[in-house]
From Swiss-Prot:
HAMAP family: MurD (MF_00639). GO terms for cellular component: cytoplasm. This is UDP-N-acetylmuramoylalanine--D-glutamate ligase. GO terms for biological process: cell division; cell wall organization; peptidoglycan biosynthetic process; regulation of cell shape. It holds the Pfam family Mur_ligase_M. Cell wall formation. Catalyzes the addition of glutamate to the nucleotide precursor UDP-N-acetylmuramoyl-L-alanine (UMA). Belongs to the MurCDEF family. Keywords: ATP-binding, Cell cycle, Cell division, Cell shape, Cell wall biogenesis/degradation, Cytoplasm, Ligase, Nucleotide-binding, Peptidoglycan synthesis. GO terms for molecular function: ATP binding; UDP-N-acetylmuramoylalanine-D-glutamate ligase activity. Pathway: Cell wall biogenesis; peptidoglycan biosynthesis. It is an enzyme of class 6 (ligase). It comes from Lactococcus lactis subsp. cremoris (strain MG1363). Its main location: cytoplasm.
Length: 449
């Protein structure tokens, strides 16, 4: 932790709670700031607000009163989920009150070097791989950011000898100022969060902010499989290293089935524990970041050959009577399911899919389902998916939910088959979150083992 005095006796407003807002409030309070927290959830339903009140922090809940900003705040720390067109944020900016997100605060309170990972897909897996490799190497890596561990809380506790491995969303990056990671990594850039950002250009601009304070002493890792990312290499002051599955590049790459870092052989690509081309990209990205932090090949190979996946993200659960089972509940859109399917032999694969109907069709998925052994469909999109399967002459069965889907499909499968839950849909028609959906699938798996 840095010895920060700039927050002492400063009036700071934390707008929006949840885990990151609560962490920011507690960190600022410990640093001597005069903290006010404002959250829209009523106090009696607001566990975070109740905890903060017990800590002596001023809490205003149930609404966002504009006149609160008349109190002459020196800074606003905004929950990343709150949009910039929120009246409170607009008023703060009109009053020239700096508005930051909690990751900027994390940078300010820690001397530990930061590896920042952003992108559209693969962030959580890549972030976890990097941390696991560094820890296997005997270093001290701390997971933080958009991965469930509030960045400011982790940063405040970190030592200068630690490495903060930080997953960063576009929402978080919009609220940085001086934030400067030692290593930044962009996994890929696809269409996402247009409801928040308004356009693809604005979304990508938010992601690109990860490198805006970097210099030639810092490293930016880019995915050269994607032309969009390749073109960014000339637009940064940072030193660029690339990863690619298609060509030899400055960082990690695949050549004739072998993985290299620069000219150094690391391992056979076939040894990776996670299936799919996208996970090969994730592994290459993690190798570059880990090598830049001095990790030995032994640690890299140890992790990449044994990593079971992040929970709900193409997570290998095990076998039931010779059938392999994977939980990819995080696949809440067609693109994510396409990436999951790329790692399997369709002729032995049973796909479990369905969920919230957002009004879209599934035509883009058809080519990825060729020769699929069978499907089980559920949720609001069950009929759409069933019709598509019938059109492609794929055996298809309907079920009530993910748990019944697994139980009911088992008699149809054979030894050597693979069962994959990759819904291609959001979970909100039947479940509160994709995590709840995945947990119920795991429970069903455990009951059948």
């Amino acid at each position: 932790m840095k010895k920060i005095t700039k927050f002492k006796d400063q009036k700071i407003l934390v707008l929006g709670l949840a885990r990151s807002g609560m962490a920011a409030a507690l960190v600022l309070n410990e640093l001597g700031a005069i903290v006010t927290v404002n959250d829209g959830k009523p106090f009696e339903e607001n566990k975070e607000a109740q905890v903060l009140l017990e800590e002596g922090i001023k809490v205003i809940t149930g609404s966002h009163p504009i006149d609160l900003l008349d109190e002459d705040f020196a800074l606003m720390v905004k929950n990343p989920g709150i949009r910039y067109d929120n009246p409170m944020v607009e008023r703060a900016e009109a009053l020239k009150i700096p508005v930051i997100t909690e990751v900027e605060l994390a940078y300010l309170v820690s001397e530990a070097p930061i590896i920042g990972i952003t992108g559209t897909n693969g962030k959580t897996t890549t972030t976890t791989l990097i941390a696991d490799i560094l820890n296997a190497d005997g270093q001290s890596a701390k997971l933080s950011g958009n991965i469930g561990f509030p960045a400011s809380e982790v940063a405040q506790k970190a030592q200068a000898t630690d490495t903060l491995v930080m997953e960063l969303s576009s929402f978080q990056l919009m609220g940085i100022d001086t934030f400067r990671p030692k290593i930044a990594l962009i996994t890929n850039l696809f269409s996402a969060h247009l409801d928040y950002h308004g356009s693809q250009e604005a979304y990508e601009a938010a992601k690109w902010r990860i490198q805006e304070n970097m210099t030639a002493d810092d490293f930016l890792i880019l995915n050269f499989n994607q032309e969009k990312c390749r073109k960014l290499a000339d637009k940064t002051k940072a030193t660029v290293l690339a990863f690619s599955t298609k060509e030899k590049v400055s960082g990690a790459y695949v050549n004739e089935g072998k993985i290299y870092f620069k000219d150094e052989f690391i391992m056979e690509a076939s040894e990776l524990s996670l299936p799919g081309d996208h996970n090969l990209e994730n592994a290459l990205a993690a190798i570059v970041a880990s090598k830049l932090r001095g990790a030995e090949n032994e640690a890299i190979v140890e992790v990449l050959t044994s990593f079971a996946g992040v929970k709900h993200r193409l997570q290998y659960l095990g076998e039931i009577d010779g059938r392999k089972v994977y939980n990819d509940s995080k696949a809440t859109n067609i693109l994510a399911t396409q990436k999951a399917l790329s790692g399997f032999d369709n002729s032995k694969l049973w796909l479990l899919a369905g969920g919230l109907d957002r009004g879209n069709g599934f035509e883009d998925l058809e080519k990825d389902l060729e020769d699929l052994k069978g499907m089980v469909v559920f949720g609001q999109t069950a009929d759409k998916l069933r019709l598509m399967a019938e059109k492609l002459n794929i055996p298809v069965f309907a079920s009530q939910n993910v748990a019944t889907a697994l139980k009911e499909i088992m008699p149809q499968t054979q030894v050597g088959d693979t069962i994959l839950l990759s819904p291609a849909c959001a979970s909100w028609d039947q479940y509160k979150t994709f995590e709840e959906r995945g947990d119920l699938f795991i429970e069903a798996f455990e009951s059948l083992k």
